[in-house]
Amino acid sequence: MNSNEFLLDSGFWGFLYKILTPVEWLQTWIMKIVHDFFVMLGVSPIGVSWVLAIIILVLVVQACIFPLFYKQMKSMRKMQALAPKMQRIQNKYKGKTDQASREAMSRETMKLYQDNDVNPAGSCLPMLIQGPVFMSMFYTLSAIPYIANGKRDALGAFDVATAKQFTQTDVFGIVSVTDNFTSAAASGKAVIGIFVFLMCFCLWFMQYFSMKRNMAAASMNKQTETMQKAMLWLFPVMYIFSGVAMPFAVLVYWLTNNVCNLCRTLWQVYAFPTPGSPAAADKEKRDHRNENARRAKAGLPSLEEEALAKAKEEAERKATQGYQRQQPVRKRKKK
Protein backbone atom coordinates (compact mmCIF):
# COMPACT_ATOMS: atom_id res chain seq x y z
CA MET A 1 0.00 0.00 0.00
CA ASN A 2 2.98 2.35 0.41
CA SER A 3 4.21 1.89 -3.15
CA ASN A 4 3.86 4.75 -5.62
CA GLU A 5 2.53 2.34 -8.23
CA PHE A 6 -0.60 0.27 -7.90
CA LEU A 7 0.71 -3.14 -8.95
CA LEU A 8 -2.71 -4.52 -9.88
CA ASP A 9 -2.85 -2.00 -12.74
CA SER A 10 0.16 -3.49 -14.52
CA GLY A 11 0.90 -6.67 -16.45
CA PHE A 12 -1.56 -9.52 -16.75
CA TRP A 13 -3.56 -8.43 -13.70
CA GLY A 14 -3.93 -4.95 -15.13
CA PHE A 15 -5.38 -6.42 -18.32
CA LEU A 16 -7.73 -8.71 -16.37
CA TYR A 17 -9.01 -6.01 -14.05
CA LYS A 18 -9.49 -3.67 -17.01
CA ILE A 19 -11.97 -6.20 -18.40
CA LEU A 20 -13.78 -6.19 -15.04
CA THR A 21 -14.05 -2.37 -14.95
CA PRO A 22 -17.88 -2.36 -15.42
CA VAL A 23 -18.26 -4.63 -12.37
CA GLU A 24 -15.88 -2.45 -10.33
CA TRP A 25 -17.74 0.68 -11.42
CA LEU A 26 -21.09 -0.79 -10.36
CA GLN A 27 -19.71 -1.90 -6.99
CA THR A 28 -18.40 1.57 -6.16
CA TRP A 29 -21.77 3.17 -6.90
CA ILE A 30 -23.68 0.63 -4.81
CA MET A 31 -21.32 1.27 -1.90
CA LYS A 32 -21.59 5.06 -2.32
CA ILE A 33 -25.39 5.04 -2.49
CA VAL A 34 -25.70 2.79 0.57
CA HIS A 35 -23.12 4.89 2.46
CA ASP A 36 -24.99 8.13 1.69
CA PHE A 37 -28.25 6.51 2.79
CA PHE A 38 -26.83 5.62 6.22
CA VAL A 39 -25.29 9.09 6.54
CA MET A 40 -28.74 10.55 5.83
CA LEU A 41 -30.02 8.44 8.74
CA GLY A 42 -27.43 10.03 11.03
CA VAL A 43 -24.61 7.46 10.89
CA SER A 44 -21.08 8.92 10.91
CA PRO A 45 -19.77 9.37 7.33
CA ILE A 46 -16.29 8.12 8.28
CA GLY A 47 -17.35 5.38 10.64
CA VAL A 48 -19.44 2.27 10.41
CA SER A 49 -21.38 3.56 7.39
CA TRP A 50 -18.68 2.32 4.99
CA VAL A 51 -18.56 -1.08 6.72
CA LEU A 52 -22.34 -1.33 6.39
CA ALA A 53 -22.00 -0.35 2.72
CA ILE A 54 -19.66 -3.30 2.15
CA ILE A 55 -22.04 -5.68 3.94
CA ILE A 56 -25.05 -4.43 1.95
CA LEU A 57 -23.04 -4.86 -1.26
CA VAL A 58 -22.56 -8.55 -0.41
CA LEU A 59 -26.29 -8.94 0.26
CA VAL A 60 -27.11 -7.28 -3.09
CA VAL A 61 -24.76 -9.67 -4.92
CA GLN A 62 -26.20 -12.67 -3.07
CA ALA A 63 -29.75 -11.57 -3.89
CA CYS A 64 -28.83 -11.24 -7.58
CA ILE A 65 -27.31 -14.72 -7.83
CA PHE A 66 -29.92 -16.50 -5.68
CA PRO A 67 -32.29 -17.16 -8.63
CA LEU A 68 -29.35 -18.76 -10.46
CA PHE A 69 -28.51 -20.78 -7.36
CA TYR A 70 -32.12 -21.94 -7.06
CA LYS A 71 -32.12 -22.96 -10.72
CA GLN A 72 -28.82 -24.77 -10.10
CA MET A 73 -30.38 -26.76 -7.25
CA LYS A 74 -33.33 -27.78 -9.42
CA SER A 75 -30.94 -28.77 -12.21
CA MET A 76 -28.85 -30.85 -9.80
CA ARG A 77 -32.01 -32.58 -8.55
CA LYS A 78 -32.89 -33.50 -12.15
CA MET A 79 -29.33 -34.70 -12.79
CA GLN A 80 -29.53 -36.93 -9.72
CA ALA A 81 -32.85 -38.35 -10.92
CA LEU A 82 -31.30 -39.09 -14.32
CA ALA A 83 -28.29 -40.88 -12.82
CA PRO A 84 -29.70 -44.43 -13.37
CA LYS A 85 -30.45 -43.67 -17.03
CA MET A 86 -27.01 -42.15 -17.45
CA GLN A 87 -25.51 -45.30 -15.96
CA ARG A 88 -27.40 -47.45 -18.45
CA ILE A 89 -26.08 -45.39 -21.37
CA GLN A 90 -22.53 -45.68 -20.06
CA ASN A 91 -22.89 -49.43 -19.57
CA LYS A 92 -24.27 -49.75 -23.09
CA TYR A 93 -21.06 -48.32 -24.56
CA LYS A 94 -18.68 -49.67 -21.95
CA GLY A 95 -15.45 -50.89 -23.54
CA LYS A 96 -16.28 -49.34 -26.92
CA THR A 97 -13.60 -46.80 -27.80
CA ASP A 98 -14.24 -46.30 -31.52
CA GLN A 99 -15.31 -42.89 -32.80
CA ALA A 100 -18.81 -44.00 -33.83
CA SER A 101 -19.58 -45.41 -30.36
CA ARG A 102 -18.33 -42.28 -28.61
CA GLU A 103 -20.45 -40.07 -30.87
CA ALA A 104 -23.51 -42.28 -30.35
CA MET A 105 -23.02 -42.15 -26.56
CA SER A 106 -22.68 -38.37 -26.71
CA ARG A 107 -25.87 -38.06 -28.80
CA GLU A 108 -27.88 -40.26 -26.43
CA THR A 109 -26.59 -38.32 -23.43
CA MET A 110 -27.46 -34.94 -24.96
CA LYS A 111 -30.91 -36.22 -25.97
CA LEU A 112 -31.48 -37.37 -22.39
CA TYR A 113 -30.56 -33.88 -21.14
CA GLN A 114 -32.78 -32.16 -23.72
CA ASP A 115 -35.79 -34.41 -23.11
CA ASN A 116 -35.61 -33.68 -19.38
CA ASP A 117 -34.70 -29.97 -19.71
CA VAL A 118 -31.37 -30.37 -17.92
CA ASN A 119 -28.30 -28.19 -18.45
CA PRO A 120 -25.20 -29.93 -17.00
CA ALA A 121 -23.23 -26.66 -17.11
CA GLY A 122 -25.89 -24.74 -15.18
CA SER A 123 -24.49 -25.77 -11.79
CA CYS A 124 -21.26 -23.86 -12.51
CA LEU A 125 -22.90 -20.51 -13.28
CA PRO A 126 -23.22 -19.10 -9.71
CA MET A 127 -19.55 -19.91 -9.02
CA LEU A 128 -18.48 -18.34 -12.33
CA ILE A 129 -20.30 -15.15 -11.34
CA GLN A 130 -19.03 -14.98 -7.75
CA GLY A 131 -15.38 -15.32 -8.82
CA PRO A 132 -15.18 -12.12 -10.92
CA VAL A 133 -17.31 -10.24 -8.38
CA PHE A 134 -14.90 -11.09 -5.55
CA MET A 135 -11.86 -10.26 -7.71
CA SER A 136 -13.42 -6.90 -8.60
CA MET A 137 -14.15 -6.18 -4.95
CA PHE A 138 -10.56 -6.99 -3.98
CA TYR A 139 -9.27 -4.68 -6.71
CA THR A 140 -11.63 -1.83 -5.81
CA LEU A 141 -10.89 -1.89 -2.08
CA SER A 142 -7.15 -2.22 -2.75
CA ALA A 143 -7.20 0.72 -5.19
CA ILE A 144 -8.99 3.18 -2.89
CA PRO A 145 -5.88 4.22 -0.87
CA TYR A 146 -4.07 5.01 -4.15
CA ILE A 147 -7.05 7.10 -5.30
CA ALA A 148 -7.00 8.94 -1.96
CA ASN A 149 -3.34 9.98 -2.31
CA GLY A 150 -3.66 10.85 -5.99
CA LYS A 151 -1.54 7.94 -7.24
CA ARG A 152 -4.44 6.54 -9.24
CA ASP A 153 -7.36 7.97 -11.21
CA ALA A 154 -10.89 7.95 -9.80
CA LEU A 155 -12.84 4.70 -10.07
CA GLY A 156 -16.59 4.96 -10.50
CA ALA A 157 -18.10 6.79 -7.52
CA PHE A 158 -14.74 6.97 -5.72
CA ASP A 159 -13.05 10.26 -6.46
CA VAL A 160 -10.24 11.63 -4.29
CA ALA A 161 -12.58 13.11 -1.66
CA THR A 162 -14.68 9.95 -1.31
CA ALA A 163 -11.58 7.75 -1.22
CA LYS A 164 -10.02 9.90 1.53
CA GLN A 165 -13.21 9.62 3.54
CA PHE A 166 -13.18 5.84 3.11
CA THR A 167 -9.53 5.49 4.23
CA GLN A 168 -10.30 7.43 7.42
CA THR A 169 -12.84 4.78 8.43
CA ASP A 170 -11.95 2.47 11.29
CA VAL A 171 -13.79 -0.27 13.14
CA PHE A 172 -14.27 0.00 16.90
CA GLY A 173 -11.56 2.69 16.81
CA ILE A 174 -9.05 -0.15 16.50
CA VAL A 175 -8.43 -1.16 12.88
CA SER A 176 -8.65 0.85 9.66
CA VAL A 177 -10.49 -0.63 6.69
CA THR A 178 -7.25 -0.32 4.69
CA ASP A 179 -5.10 -2.17 7.26
CA ASN A 180 -3.96 -5.75 6.82
CA PHE A 181 -2.46 -8.03 9.45
CA THR A 182 1.12 -6.79 8.97
CA SER A 183 0.29 -3.06 8.94
CA ALA A 184 -2.24 -3.03 11.79
CA ALA A 185 -1.42 -2.27 15.42
CA ALA A 186 -1.49 -5.06 18.02
CA SER A 187 -5.18 -4.55 18.82
CA GLY A 188 -5.95 -4.36 15.09
CA LYS A 189 -4.11 -7.63 14.53
CA ALA A 190 -6.41 -9.25 17.10
CA VAL A 191 -9.53 -8.02 15.29
CA ILE A 192 -8.18 -9.17 11.91
CA GLY A 193 -7.25 -12.53 13.45
CA ILE A 194 -10.81 -12.97 14.73
CA PHE A 195 -12.24 -12.17 11.30
CA VAL A 196 -9.88 -14.63 9.59
CA PHE A 197 -10.80 -17.32 12.13
CA LEU A 198 -14.53 -16.75 11.56
CA MET A 199 -14.00 -16.89 7.79
CA CYS A 200 -12.17 -20.20 8.09
CA PHE A 201 -14.74 -21.62 10.51
CA CYS A 202 -17.66 -20.75 8.21
CA LEU A 203 -15.94 -22.48 5.30
CA TRP A 204 -14.94 -25.49 7.40
CA PHE A 205 -18.41 -25.95 8.91
CA MET A 206 -20.08 -25.54 5.51
CA GLN A 207 -17.96 -28.36 4.07
CA TYR A 208 -18.26 -30.52 7.21
CA PHE A 209 -22.05 -30.17 7.29
CA SER A 210 -22.35 -31.04 3.59
CA MET A 211 -20.08 -34.06 3.99
CA LYS A 212 -21.91 -35.43 7.05
CA ARG A 213 -25.49 -34.63 6.08
CA ASN A 214 -25.61 -34.42 2.27
CA MET A 215 -23.41 -37.25 0.99
CA ALA A 216 -25.08 -40.44 -0.23
CA ALA A 217 -23.67 -43.56 1.43
CA ALA A 218 -23.44 -45.27 -1.97
CA SER A 219 -21.09 -42.58 -3.29
CA MET A 220 -18.75 -42.69 -0.29
CA ASN A 221 -15.79 -44.96 -0.95
CA LYS A 222 -12.41 -44.76 0.74
CA GLN A 223 -10.89 -42.58 -1.98
CA THR A 224 -13.80 -40.12 -1.95
CA GLU A 225 -13.79 -39.94 1.84
CA THR A 226 -10.04 -39.27 1.91
CA MET A 227 -10.38 -36.49 -0.66
CA GLN A 228 -13.31 -34.91 1.20
CA LYS A 229 -11.38 -34.89 4.48
CA ALA A 230 -8.36 -33.33 2.77
CA MET A 231 -10.51 -30.56 1.26
CA LEU A 232 -12.17 -30.05 4.64
CA TRP A 233 -8.87 -28.71 6.03
CA LEU A 234 -7.04 -27.56 2.89
CA PHE A 235 -9.22 -24.58 1.98
CA PRO A 236 -9.51 -23.15 5.53
CA VAL A 237 -5.70 -23.30 5.84
CA MET A 238 -5.38 -21.47 2.50
CA TYR A 239 -7.76 -18.83 3.89
CA ILE A 240 -5.38 -18.19 6.78
CA PHE A 241 -2.46 -17.30 4.53
CA SER A 242 -4.51 -15.24 2.08
CA GLY A 243 -6.65 -13.60 4.77
CA VAL A 244 -3.76 -12.04 6.69
CA ALA A 245 -2.59 -10.32 3.48
CA MET A 246 -5.98 -8.79 2.63
CA PRO A 247 -7.10 -5.28 3.62
CA PHE A 248 -9.62 -5.38 6.46
CA ALA A 249 -12.35 -4.07 4.13
CA VAL A 250 -11.88 -7.18 1.97
CA LEU A 251 -12.12 -9.36 5.09
CA VAL A 252 -15.47 -7.74 5.93
CA TYR A 253 -16.69 -8.57 2.43
CA TRP A 254 -15.24 -12.09 2.60
CA LEU A 255 -16.67 -12.95 6.03
CA THR A 256 -20.12 -11.62 5.11
CA ASN A 257 -20.03 -13.61 1.88
CA ASN A 258 -19.02 -16.79 3.76
CA VAL A 259 -21.85 -16.35 6.25
CA CYS A 260 -24.31 -15.97 3.36
CA ASN A 261 -22.89 -19.05 1.64
CA LEU A 262 -23.16 -21.03 4.88
CA CYS A 263 -26.82 -20.04 5.33
CA ARG A 264 -27.51 -20.92 1.71
CA THR A 265 -25.85 -24.33 2.15
CA LEU A 266 -27.94 -25.07 5.25
CA TRP A 267 -31.07 -24.23 3.28
CA GLN A 268 -29.90 -26.28 0.29
CA VAL A 269 -29.32 -29.39 2.40
CA TYR A 270 -32.72 -28.89 4.05
CA ALA A 271 -34.70 -28.29 0.84
CA PHE A 272 -32.68 -30.09 -1.87
CA PRO A 273 -30.78 -32.95 -0.20
CA THR A 274 -28.80 -35.50 -2.19
CA PRO A 275 -30.82 -38.72 -2.67
CA GLY A 276 -29.58 -41.44 -0.33
CA SER A 277 -28.07 -38.99 2.16
CA PRO A 278 -29.08 -38.61 5.83
CA ALA A 279 -30.61 -35.22 4.97
CA ALA A 280 -32.74 -36.87 2.26
CA ALA A 281 -34.02 -39.45 4.76
CA ASP A 282 -34.98 -36.64 7.14
CA LYS A 283 -36.72 -34.75 4.33
CA GLU A 284 -38.69 -37.86 3.37
CA LYS A 285 -39.92 -38.23 6.96
CA ARG A 286 -40.67 -34.50 7.13
CA ASP A 287 -42.64 -34.57 3.86
CA HIS A 288 -44.53 -37.64 5.11
CA ARG A 289 -45.55 -35.84 8.32
CA ASN A 290 -46.54 -32.70 6.42
CA GLU A 291 -48.66 -34.68 3.95
CA ASN A 292 -50.46 -36.48 6.77
CA ALA A 293 -51.06 -33.14 8.49
CA ARG A 294 -52.48 -31.69 5.26
CA ARG A 295 -54.74 -34.71 4.79
CA ALA A 296 -55.97 -34.53 8.39
CA LYS A 297 -56.80 -30.85 7.95
CA ALA A 298 -58.73 -31.64 4.76
CA GLY A 299 -60.56 -34.57 6.37
CA LEU A 300 -58.78 -37.14 4.19
CA PRO A 301 -57.31 -40.48 5.28
CA SER A 302 -53.62 -40.57 6.18
CA LEU A 303 -51.03 -42.14 3.89
CA GLU A 304 -50.95 -45.23 6.11
CA GLU A 305 -54.76 -45.53 6.10
CA GLU A 306 -54.84 -45.11 2.33
CA ALA A 307 -52.16 -47.79 1.84
CA LEU A 308 -54.04 -50.13 4.21
CA ALA A 309 -57.31 -49.57 2.31
CA LYS A 310 -55.62 -50.31 -1.02
CA ALA A 311 -54.04 -53.48 0.39
CA LYS A 312 -57.43 -54.61 1.73
CA GLU A 313 -59.09 -53.87 -1.60
CA GLU A 314 -56.41 -55.85 -3.45
CA ALA A 315 -56.81 -58.79 -1.07
CA GLU A 316 -60.59 -58.80 -1.58
CA ARG A 317 -60.14 -58.66 -5.36
CA LYS A 318 -57.79 -61.64 -5.30
CA ALA A 319 -60.17 -63.57 -3.05
CA THR A 320 -63.06 -62.88 -5.42
CA GLN A 321 -61.08 -63.99 -8.48
CA GLY A 322 -59.78 -67.08 -6.71
CA TYR A 323 -56.19 -65.92 -7.08
CA GLN A 324 -56.42 -66.64 -10.81
CA ARG A 325 -54.00 -64.63 -12.87
CA GLN A 326 -55.68 -62.90 -15.77
CA GLN A 327 -53.93 -63.95 -18.95
CA PRO A 328 -53.03 -61.20 -21.38
CA VAL A 329 -54.98 -61.17 -24.64
CA ARG A 330 -52.78 -61.77 -27.63
CA LYS A 331 -53.32 -59.31 -30.41
CA ARG A 332 -53.49 -60.69 -33.91
CA LYS A 333 -51.27 -59.11 -36.50
CA LYS A 334 -53.03 -57.26 -39.24
CA LYS A 335 -52.53 -58.75 -42.68
Curated annotation (Swiss-Prot):
Protein name: Membrane protein insertase YidC
Transmembrane region(s): 46-66, 127-147, 191-211, 232-252
Keywords of the record: Cell membrane, Chaperone, Membrane, Protein transport, Transmembrane, Transmembrane helix, Transport
Keyword Transmembrane: yes
Biased composition (Basic and acidic residues): 281-294, 307-319
Membrane protein topology class: Multi-pass membrane protein
Subunit structure: Interacts with the Sec translocase complex via SecD. Specifically interacts with transmembrane segments of nascent integral membrane proteins during membrane integration.
Record's GO cellular component terms: plasma membrane
Molecular function terms, GO-annotated: membrane insertase activity
GO terms (BP aspect): protein insertion into membrane; protein transport
Alphabetized PANTHER family for the sequence: CYTOCHROME C OXIDASE ASSEMBLY PROTEIN COX18, MITOCHONDRIAL, OXA1
Record localization: Cell membrane
Organism: Bifidobacterium longum (strain NCC 2705)
UniProt keyword Transferase, yes or no: no
Family: Belongs to the OXA1/ALB3/YidC family. Type 1 subfamily.
Purpose of the protein: Required for the insertion and/or proper folding and/or complex formation of integral membrane proteins into the membrane. Involved in integration of membrane proteins that insert both dependently and independently of the Sec translocase complex, as well as at least some lipoproteins. Aids folding of multispanning membrane proteins.
One protein family per Pfam: 60KD_IMP
Region annotation Disordered: where it falls in the sequence: 277-335
